[in-house]
Amino acid sequence: MLIFQAFIQSPGETFLNLGFLTIRWYGFLISVSVIIGLFVSKKLAKARNINPLYISEILPSLIIFSIIGARAYYVIFEWRQYSGENLFTSLELFNNTIQIPSFLAVWEGGIAIHGGLIGGLLSIIYFCKSKNIHLKTFIDILIPSIILGQSIGRWGNFFNNEAFGVPTNLPWKLFIPIQNRPLEFINYEFFHPTFLYESLWNFLIFILLIFVFNKQNKTDFFRPGFISCLYLISYSFGRFWIEGLRTDPLCIGGLPPFCSGGIRMAQFISIFLFSSGLIGIFFLRLRTYSCKNRKNG
């Protein structure tokens, strides 16, 4: 009897070692996401008769605020990892080793997408007000690139051996080195590749959003803001399920891996965002009907 056995294994966190400078996969993937996102957003901006240069203008502040928000969100809920003996970490730069506060070491992993969304949204709101751009239309232009960036960025978790799920023996199981396993699962070798689940789910959302974007000017059903609401609904739906598999959740009133006695923060936020998306679509439809009634009246 032939038994198929296979598993996924990270080759390591280093993408390129130049001797004087080490480039990690996490940073490389973020850079790739930014470049692709810039290209996609400019294309979508042209389709809505919005100056593509606005995308280039907002990019620096969007990146900075998103990273700050994502890191701050994670550090706040995982402060025990960045305090006491872990307050500082080593950074090799030009053949020198320096000590920096560990909460600044974003390249080592430890960011939360919900925090990044909050930071990015604040940047977008300020930019749209300063440029007098329609907020909902501009967010609809950026959202497809954001979810595509999330899809690409999730692979950073793979290379860092982090954000994996509970033990499994499925054919697509992920091997995790013993030093990266939670104490509760120290004797298990294979885990759910939740990074892969979320990456694939996010890419499907990207395709859906692009489809809706191309239909947006052809029907009143997809008003400005619809794509943003659809993103909140679809992403939150998938994230809620995937989060339930993970062994490293940010917890409220509990401890990983199962947040016993508490709740998983990402699932709580997902419920809120899912509901917000539904409410948003309801009001968009209500406004559409109101406009039609005024025209017919």
Swiss-Prot record:
Where located? Cell inner membrane
User: What does the entry list under GO cellular component?
Assistant: plasma membrane
Q: Which GO-annotated molecular functions does the record name?
A: phosphatidylglycerol-prolipoprotein diacylglyceryl transferase activity
| Membrane topology, from the record | Multi-pass membrane protein
Q: Which residues bind a 1,2-diacyl-sn-glycero-3-phospho-(1'-sn-glycerol)?
A: 154
Return the similarity comment: Belongs to the Lgt family.
Membrane-spanning parts: 20-40, 50-70, 105-125, 133-153, 193-213, 225-245, 266-286
In Swiss-Prot or TrEMBL terms, this protein is called Phosphatidylglycerol--prolipoprotein diacylglyceryl transferase
State which gene encodes it: lgt
Q: Which HAMAP family match?
A: Lgt
* Pathway given in the UniProt record: Protein modification; lipoprotein biosynthesis (diacylglyceryl transfer)
Q: What does this protein do?
A: Catalyzes the transfer of the diacylglyceryl group from phosphatidylglycerol to the sulfhydryl group of the N-terminal cysteine of a prolipoprotein, the first step in the formation of mature lipoproteins.
Under the heading InterPro entries, the entry gives: Lgt
Please classify the protein's predominant subcellular localization into one broad category: membrane
* EC number(s) per entry: 2.5.1.145
Q: Which PROSITE patterns match?
A: LGT
> Which species is this UniProt entry from?
Prochlorococcus marinus (strain MIT 9312)
Residue stretches in coiled coil: none
- Stored PANTHER family: PHOSPHATIDYLGLYCEROL--PROLIPOPROTEIN DIACYLGLYCERYL TRANSFERASE, PROLIPOPROTEIN DIACYLGLYCERYL TRANSFERASE
